[in-house]
Each structure stands twice: as C-alpha cells, then as structure tokens.
Amino acid sequence: MGKSKSATKVVAEIKATKPLKKGKREPEDDIDTKVSLKKQKKDVIAAVQKEKAVKKVPKKVESSDDSDSESEEEEKAKKVPAKKAASSSDESSDDSSSDDEPAPKKAVAATNGTVAKKSKDDSSSSDDDSSDEEVAVTKKPAAAAKNGSVKAKKESSSEDDSSSEDEPAKKPAAKIAKPAAKDSSSSDDDSDEDSEDEKPATKKAAPAAAKAASSSDSSDEDSDEESEDEKPAQKKADTKASKKSSSDESSESEEDESEDEEETPKKKSSDVEMVDAEKSSAKQPKTPSTPAAGGSKTLFAANLSFNIERADVENFFKEAGEVVDVRFSTNRDDGSFRGFGHVEFASSEEAQKALEFHGRPLLGREIRLDIAQERGERGERPAFTPQSGNFRSGGDGGDEKKIFVKGFDASLSEDDIKNTLREHFSSCGEIKNVSVPIDRDTGNSKGIAYLEFSEGKEKALELNGSDMGGGFYLVVDEPRPRGDSSGGGGFGRGNGRFGSGGGRGRDGGRGRFGSGGGRGRDGGRGRFGSGGGRGSDRGRGRPSFTPQGKKTTFGDE
C-alpha cells in the first residue's frame, strides 16, 4: 500500500509540474527545475521504478540484485557525462520542437508528443525509462501497423507515460526516435542508489532497444526510400517496357516497311520487264524475222537535184514512212554533191511503199528509186553508196534480180547505152530497169550500168565476156561493193578520166579514180590510187583520203 501511496504522490507532483510546459521555450530554466525536482523525489521515483521493474523485467531485477558494488561504481562514473548528454538532448529536442511547430499537420502530432515526453522527463525519468523500453520493443511492429502499436502501449504503461511516448511512436521520424533514446539514458542516470543495481541490465537493454528502434526506423525509412526508388524504377521499367514495346512495334513496322520495300523492287523489276517486253514487241514489226522479197530498208535514189537537202527528202517520203537516215554521195575532190544517194527507212515495208514514188518529181527532177542491199547482208557488207567511177545503181545491188555490167562504150550517151544494153540482154528475159550512172561534172557515163530483171538473171550472168561489137567485151557479175571490184579486162578506150579497164591509153586502166593497174603511163598511180606497178591489181579498194604513191602533174592540167 505504501507503494501505491507513493504512486499517487507521483501523480500529484506531475500535475504540479505541468505548467512548466508553457515555459519550455527557455531551456536554461527548464534544466534547473529538472535538477531540483530530481533531487527531492529520488525516493518516490525509486519506489515506482522498483514496482514497474518487478512487474515487467523480473529477470533483470534478479540480475541487478546480484550485481556487486563494482557495477555501482562504474555507474557513478558514468552519471556525469550521461547528464550532459541528457541536457544536450533536451536542448536539441526543445529546439527541434520549437522549430517543428510551424510544420505540417503530420509533424504537429509528433511535436506535441515530444513536449509531453519532455515534461514527463522533468517529473519522472524512471517512468520514461520503462516507457522507452516499451517504445523500443514496439517500434518494429509500428512500422507495419502504427495504430495497433499505439493501443498496445496504452495497455502496458500508465496513461501519462503512454501519452508522452506513444504519440511519438504513432508517426515518428528518425530524428524524433533518437532523442527518445537519449532521454531514456538520462532518466537512468537520475535514479538513486537502490535502483543502480537494476540499471546495468536495463541500460544495456535500453540502448540496444534504442539502436534496434533507430535501426528499425532507418530500415523503415530505407524501405520507404526503397519503395519510392522502386516506384521510379517501376516507372522506368514501365517506360522501358513501353519503349521496348514501341521499339518492337517500330521494328515490326520497319520489317513491314522492309517487306513493302522488297515488294516494290519486285514490282519495279516486273515493270522494267514489262517495259522491255513492250519495247521488244514494238520493235518486232520494225524488224521482221522473215523479210519480204527485196526486204531491204534502204532505197537508192538517183537524178536528185543538186540543191536538195535532207529535209526535202524526209518531206518527200513522209507519206511512205519514217526516214531514219539520208546519205548523199559526194565528190571526194571538192565535196560536191553527185546527184544520188541512199535513203534508209524504219522498216522494209516502208521502203517498199516508198519505192512506189519512183518517177515522181522532186525539186523539178523525176526521182529514180531502186532497192539497195541492206547493211549486214551478203557477208556482213554494208550498204554501198557510190563515191567514184565504180558507182553502181542500187548500191550493193544484192537483189536477186540485178546484175552489174561494165566494159561497154562509155562515150555513148545515157540513152544509147541503155538501148544497147537492153538489146544485148533481151534474150535473157524481161528487163524491168536499166540504170547508167552519169558523172555530173562531165555529163558522161561512168562506164558501168545496172540491169534489173523480172526473171532470167541467171541467163544474163552467162553473158559475161560477151562481145558487144566494136571490140567491147562485157563484164557481167553480181552487184558487189566497190572494194570487191577488180580493175583490168578488155581493150576499152581506157583513157577517159574515169577509165575503169586496163586499156593502153595515157592513163589507161586507172583514171582519176581508177581501181586497177594496167599498162598506162601512170598505171596503178592514180591520184587516189593505193597501189601501183605495171599490170598490178594493188589499186583495188575504196580510195583513201590520204594520197599514197607518187604525185604527178601533167602539162595539160
């Protein structure tokens, strides 16, 4: 009963010290008041502490009763620095409480709890010790469920102690929990000699509990920080996942685009193939694989005006078809036009249609047309455009119905030559056309002619070497390019400017553009001849642009 009376006295004295809460803003006055109250009420505190220690820590009481005087001496030696620590902790707690007053509502509850706790430290530090132990024990479950820990503390301790210690445990920060641990150490120092036996055990338990509490708080804070860190980490993970998904989508879209791109080149290649097919189909009618008879695309055109131009020819044949090329024969001496040439069309059908224009007037002259041998025919020989005395109507003359004739009397007029040739070859078959090239400079025949038969060409070729009378022997052959013609043969006059045989004249067999050797004075040395020598055939071939051999001048020139 005595203990209960002392307990009631403690409650009355605590009420007397409550007004000290208002003057708590002056830390120095509070410290002096605390010291005086502690000295006067050592007995009461000792009784209360023993009662609570017996109830709550029986094992520790037994160990403290058995402790010797050495622990008491050690405890006395530790009292002075502990008091200093308590005063400093009180000052710091006061400052923190005064600083925390304008804080948010969450911090207000914590500051109120610390004020109540400090007032209780002034009145009964032993009560704080026991309550500190409870706080230290209950801090770990408080991190999981704070409201449950508050109720447990109220049941285990007195109302005053629970109000002072449970409120800081309700929503504590790490800074509030640490001063509570320091207050518990200061309350241990204020106890009397009777309670000193218990303190070695309780002090060891209290700092450990405080450390555990601080560690639990720090672990809670760490866990909170980790949870907060985990949130941005989750956000980052979410963003990464979204980025990954977006990257996957982008990769899929890129793959789709790549597939589309792969499909488009295929389409392009097919388009190219279609275009090529269209081109080839467009070209097929222009180049038939089986050309018609006389399927050359080139026409020989003679009796042309000397003032003619390419545009005149294109306009003349525009009704027949497309004119691809026009080649006029020119004189190699001065480059003057010789009055004939070749016209190439886009197709053989167009050339055949243009052949119907034979005899029509072109710039005041009736044009004479004939089919010329196409390029590449007869052993890949090109179409022949005559440039000299070896001129043959129709160019290469590869048509099956044409023959080449020379060796006749070239001094005759064009009409006389035609009539003579018609009479000579009349027995072979029907003659469709006779062409006698004329030198426009002199107006004389070039000594050659072309005959076209409807039929009977083979019989006409049999007349090669036949005598036309007057000592003229004909040379009859297939139409050939100039390079394949040979000089010599016969006893023609041979002294003409364009003599083509091997006669005995001054320039026999050579002439200005002669192609064969002979006995002439300058045999084989014509102005554009490429060979020489008595009786030599080295002069064959088309005349070269660069004169070769010895240049001779004559007095009559």
UniProtKB/Swiss-Prot annotation:
Residues 174-184, 203-217 have a biased composition (Low complexity). Disruption phenotype: Reduced growth, bushy plants with stunted leaves, abnormal vascular patterns and many stems. Plants exhibit a pointed narrow shape of leaves, but no filamentous leaves. Plants with double mutations in this protein and in AS2 or AS1 protein show severe defects in leaf shape and filamentous leaves are efficiently formed, although a few normally shaped leaves and markedly narrow leaves are also generated. Altered nucleolus ultrastructure. InterPro entries: NUCL_RRM1, NUCL_RRM2, Nucleotide-bd_a/b_plait_sf, RBD_domain_sf, RRM_dom. Induction: By glucose and sucrose (at protein level). It comes from the Eukaryota. Residues 485-503 have a biased composition (Gly residues). GO terms for molecular function: DNA binding; mRNA binding. The keyword Lyase does not apply. It is found in: Nucleus, Nucleolus. Expressed in roots, leaves, shoots and flowers. Residues 1-297, 376-398, 474-557 are annotated as: Disordered. Keywords: DNA-binding, Nucleus, Repeat, Repressor, RNA-binding, rRNA processing, Stress response. The keyword S-adenosyl-L-methionine does not apply. Residues 297-374, 401-481 form the RRM domain. GO terms for biological process: cotyledon vascular tissue pattern formation; leaf development; leaf vascular tissue pattern formation; petal vascular tissue pattern formation; ribosome biogenesis; root development; rRNA processing; sepal vascular tissue pattern formation. One of its GO terms (cellular component) is nucleus. Residues 49-63, 230-247, 264-281 have a biased composition (Basic and acidic residues). Disruption of NUCL1 induces NUCL2 expression. Involved in pre-rRNA processing and ribosome assembly. Is associated with intranucleolar chromatin and pre-ribosomal particles and plays a role in controlling activation and repression of a specific subset of rRNA genes located in distinctive nucleolar organizer regions. Binds specifically rDNA chromatin and may be required to maintain rDNA chromatin structure, but is probably not required for the overall histone methylation status of 45S rRNA genes. Interacts with THAL in the nucleus. This is Nucleolin 1. It comes from Arabidopsis thaliana (Mouse-ear cress). The gene is NUCL1.
